[in-house]
Design a protein with these regions (language model features):
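Hydrophobic membrane-insertion alpha-helices, especially the h-region
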Residues: 1-15
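Short, solvent-exposed recognition patches
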Residues: 26-128
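A short, solvent-exposed beta-edge/loop patch
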Residues: 100-171
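Short, flexible coil/linker elements and helix-boundary hinge sites characteristic
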Residues: 17, 41-42, 84, 143, ...
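Hydrophobic single-pass membrane-insertion segments
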Residues: 13-24
């Protein structure tokens, strides 16, 4: 009986021991990421051509750090360039609720409000569809001031990406 209890404790410890402390798990390919996320959640994964970028990393978001954790979203990371400025970019989604007050929408497409946050070195578009929070972030060096034309290009790319995500979920 004692041996059974010891084995039970060991099995439990192995199952709940953190294997993904960041709650992110690498995906081998875009296809594996899309298939896994769409099979195990209600989240739709946009194509890698969502932004004018090069995707460098694909990750599954997990709902916890243990072996028993379930897929709860994804993150695609990459780089893009405009006007000689290098941007790091990330598209991610997870199940969440709206927290705090949001500003007035930057855009409303198909009745879905899109919020834009920007600061020196940073752009973030955020939208909520069926309980999932989609976030697109672009970071660039804070000491760089984007010319108006490049800033408009970035905002147009963000808006097109948000519309693409909304269309994907409406279809």
């Amino acid at each position: 009986m004692v041996l059974l209890a010891i084995v039970g404790v060991i099995v439990y410890a192995v199952m709940v021991w953190p294997v993904n402390p960041t709650r992110m798990k690498p995906a081998e390919s875009y296809e594996q990421l899309r298939d896994t996320v769409e099979k195990k959640t209600d989240i739709r994964v946009p194509g890698e051509d969502l932004l004018p970028w090069t995707v460098t990393e694909r990750q599954l978001r997990m709902d916890g750090p243990s072996r028993l954790a379930k897929v709860s979203g994804f993150a695609l990371s990459g780089t893009m360039e405009r006007g000689g400025v290098a941007f790091s970019a990330e598209v991610s989604v997870g199940v969440t609720g709206v927290v705090g007050d949001l500003p007035s929408p930057w855009d409303v497409y198909r009745h879905v409000p899109v919020y834009l946050f920007r600061n020196q070195g940073f752009y973030m578009a955020q939208l909520y569809i069926d309980g999932s929070e989609y976030i697109i972030q672009l970071h660039y060096p804070e000491n760089v001031t984007l010319p108006e034309e490049d800033a408009a290009y970035v905002e147009d790319a963000l808006q097109a990406a948000c519309h693409n995500i909304i269309d994907l979920n409406e279809g």
